[in-house]
Amino acid sequence: MPPMGPQKKKADSWAGGSISMPLREDLLTPIAGENPSGIDLRHDTKLLIHDKIKEARRQDDDLAQGDWQSERKTANFPLVVKIAQDALATVSKDLQVAAWLTEGLLQTEGFSGLRVGIGLCQSLLTDFWDTVYPESE
């Protein structure tokens, strides 16, 4: 199926998927400014989007803790989805962020979320090939 561009496809229907949590319609809209893919988040020291997503994804193992039991940290995948969508729409077309969004969609929506996330990654590669992050070497 040939790429249709961001204006011709509904954000939550990439690759034929349908999810209960709506994706933002502007995920494939170019970022305002000189580069349509925005900034490289790997070198960002202000927004720290990668760090925020990593923290939201972090969870403790299910290992016995003996006498020093503490509350186990669980991943917050709805927060991962929100941060990733905000970043992709307004800051950077970043494949690592798109992959984390896909993981979040899989965890919150199941296989239909995975299908939508993979479709988003494919669309980012198609629509932003020359400028998507990380840049090809």
Which residues make up each language-model segment?
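N-terminal domain-start signal
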Residues: 1-136
